[in-house]
């Protein structure tokens, strides 16, 4: 501490001296100042010293030499902070420029345990500089755009729980290095009750010494989950704009200005930087194509193709309308985020909140878009920190979204999860406050959202019954889509997941398989009797020439009979050879389907 204070005193004294020289020079002769915002770019320290070769006077040369000396002193002091943690700062080394980093065979052996623990190669991460640069994958036009100097300031919020220290600090360094100083209000680190000791005192001491006054650390007293942890970060933010990021990202140069400019134009826009991938094994940065963010009816997020009007415009730098968000990064006006109810605090852990925000923003007067001119690279981990029964939490959260925002289309979420509409067996908590919020904001209905924001989403309003289909002669097995390439339905021990999701429609079609997502991707297939084979086929409904061959008569606890052939779907017991699913003349076998829609 004493040595650090001496450095600070020395720095202040020298800066005063330098300021005197600069004022003296300013009065003696004009000094050309570079325009633009290059001051916030990362530069090798030697670059300042090299400018002395172009000095116009011995006095200016002395000033530049003094600045170079000061920079060396400060750099050595700050770099010592990272060295004490076993980490690296600077501009070279492994993984520079987003290239794949490697380990020796001996190091590879040491890396196995940490890799399994974190879901990425944390041992390798410690060998990569906190300041490394990554590729600039922005469209060419983006690099030519100019932005106002009077943009709003941003508070960058990182959420972490038991993350590798090197990965967190690289996220912080990258944010500082690639966000203009006058636009970066603060960085907020929200620790969702981590167990790792290095994420406590060592982390706090480092960020407060390395970036004094810039970084706040918020500690949750119990594990809240990503959703509520982000809300805690928002509560302490003071910037006009808040950016929420996973704590395993790296920023591309120029990422902030286009985001803040779009929000300055319209405070009700939620902006998503385009996402690139950091490979979890070697930290290579891999470009992802420009995409919108959509979701399935289970409310699992996914990348989808940008809308047709974006493609028709022929300009890859334009914003991309998106129905929802993947969730690893989003930026929003702080007040607007509060006005629309933040994220749903009644949700647990994570999953579904990203879909809820997209739906809510669009229905309640805002918009959401992906910006190709702003890019953030993100590690897709093999292992998640909140991995205890995450499927249950996602299901529960999805039902909250359905009950509050989806009107009659809420049935699609229940169908996708194979749950009854009434008494699904999951306590989703009280949603009255979220419904009251929707009413107070005078939000549109979900039909409008599907028609205008997510028209690509497949709809299944014609469903009358769904779930596992069981035969009274073989109750332990269910109708199953079997291997996709065989195009034949089979019987398989009941498990209730997607391959066994049967859906009977008003038209008499019998679909089998998980619900489809967008019209650009395959839909669930139809059960077909082609009149020739004893085996029931699963085919693309639109490609079946005879409508009758894909229509079935079925009532609960009754036969399933094809309208075109009159044959029934039945099971045949072949003794030790097993049970087959076949088509034949009806013998009175009966089928039951798990759920119905009244």
UniProtKB/Swiss-Prot annotation:
Tissue specificity remark: Highly expressed in brain and heart. Weakly expressed in kidney, liver, lung and spleen.
PROSITE patterns, per the entry: RICIN_B_LECTIN
Keyword DNA damage: no
Ligand binding (Mn(2+)): 246, 248, 378
Subcellular location: Golgi apparatus membrane
Region entry Catalytic subdomain A, spans: 151-262
Catalytic subdomain B: annotated span: 319-381
This protein's name: Polypeptide N-acetylgalactosaminyltransferase 17
Lineage summary: Eukaryota, Metazoa, Chordata, Craniata, Vertebrata
């Amino acid at each position: 501490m004493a040595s650090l204070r001496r450095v600070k005193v020395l720095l202040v004294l020298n800066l005063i001296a330098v300021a005197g020289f600069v004022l003296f020079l300013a009065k003696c002769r004009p000094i050309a100042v570079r325009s633009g915002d290059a001051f916030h770019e990362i530069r090798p320290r030697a670059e300042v010293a090299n400018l002395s070769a172009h000095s116009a006077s011995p006095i200016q040369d002395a000033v530049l030499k003094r600045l170079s000396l000061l920079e060396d002193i400060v750099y050595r002091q700050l770099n010592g902070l990272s060295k004490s943690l076993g980490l690296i700062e600077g501009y070279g080394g492994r993984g520079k420029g987003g290239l794949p980093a490697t380990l020796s065979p001996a190091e590879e052996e040491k890396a196995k345990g940490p890799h399994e623990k974190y879901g990425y190669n944390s041992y390798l991460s410690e060998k990569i500089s906190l300041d490394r640069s990554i590729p600039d994958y922005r469209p060419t036009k983006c690099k030519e755009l100019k932005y106002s100097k009077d943009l709003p300031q941003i508070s960058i919020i990182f959420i972490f729980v038991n993350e590798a220290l090197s990965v967190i600090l690289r996220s912080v360094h990258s944010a500082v290095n690639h966000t203009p100083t006058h636009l970066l209000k603060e960085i907020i680190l929200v620790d969702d009750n981590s167990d790792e000791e290095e994420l406590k005192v060592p982390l706090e001491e480092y960020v407060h010494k390395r970036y004094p006054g810039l970084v706040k650390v918020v500690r949750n007293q119990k594990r809240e989950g990503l959703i509520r942890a982000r809300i805690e970060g928002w509560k302490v933010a003071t910037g006009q704009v808040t950016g929420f990021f996973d704590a395993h990202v790296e920023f591309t140069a120029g990422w902030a200005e286009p985001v803040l400019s779009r929000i300055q134009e319209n405070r009700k826009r939620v902006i998503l930087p385009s996402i690139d991938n950091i490979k979890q094994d070697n930290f290579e940065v891999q470009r992802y194509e420009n995409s919108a963010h959509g979701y399935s009816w289970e409310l699992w997020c996914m990348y989808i193709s940008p809308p047709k009007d974006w493609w028709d415009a022929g300009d890859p730098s334009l914003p991309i309308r998106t129905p929802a968000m993947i969730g690893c990064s989003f930026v929003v006006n702080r007040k607007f985020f509060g006005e629309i109810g933040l994220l749903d605090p009644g949700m647990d852990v994570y999953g579904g909140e990203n879909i809820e925000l997209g739906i809510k923003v669009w229905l309640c007067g805002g918009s959401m878009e992906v910006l190709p001119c702003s890019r953030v690279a993100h590690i897709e981990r093999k292992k998640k920190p909140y991995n205890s029964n995450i499927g249950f939490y996602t299901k529960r959260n999805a039902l909250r979204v359905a009950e509050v925002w989806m009107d009659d289309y809420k049935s699609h979420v229940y169908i996708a999860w194979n749950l009854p509409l009434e008494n699904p067996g999951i306590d989703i908590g009280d949603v009255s406050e979220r419904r009251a919020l929707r009413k107070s904001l005078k939000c549109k209905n979900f039909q409008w959202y599907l028609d205008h924001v997510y028209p690509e989403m497949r709809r299944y309003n014609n469903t009358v019954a769904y779930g596992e289909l069981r035969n009274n002669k073989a109750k332990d097995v269910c109708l199953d889509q079997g291997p996709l390439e065989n195009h034949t339905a089979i019987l398989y021990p009941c498990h209730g997941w997607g391959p066994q999701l049967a859906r009977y429609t008003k038209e008499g079609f019998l679909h089998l398989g998980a619900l489809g997502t967008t019209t650009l991707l395959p839909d669930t297939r139809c059960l077909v009797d082609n009149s020739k084979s004893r085996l029931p086929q699963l085919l693309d409904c639109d490609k079946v020439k005879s409508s009758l061959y894909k229509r079935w008569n079925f009532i609960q606890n009754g036969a399933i009979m094809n309208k075109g052939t009159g044959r029934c779907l039945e099971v045949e017991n072949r003794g030790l050879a097993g049970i087959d699913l076949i088509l034949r003349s009806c013998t009175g076998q009966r089928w039951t389907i798990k759920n119905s829609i009244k």
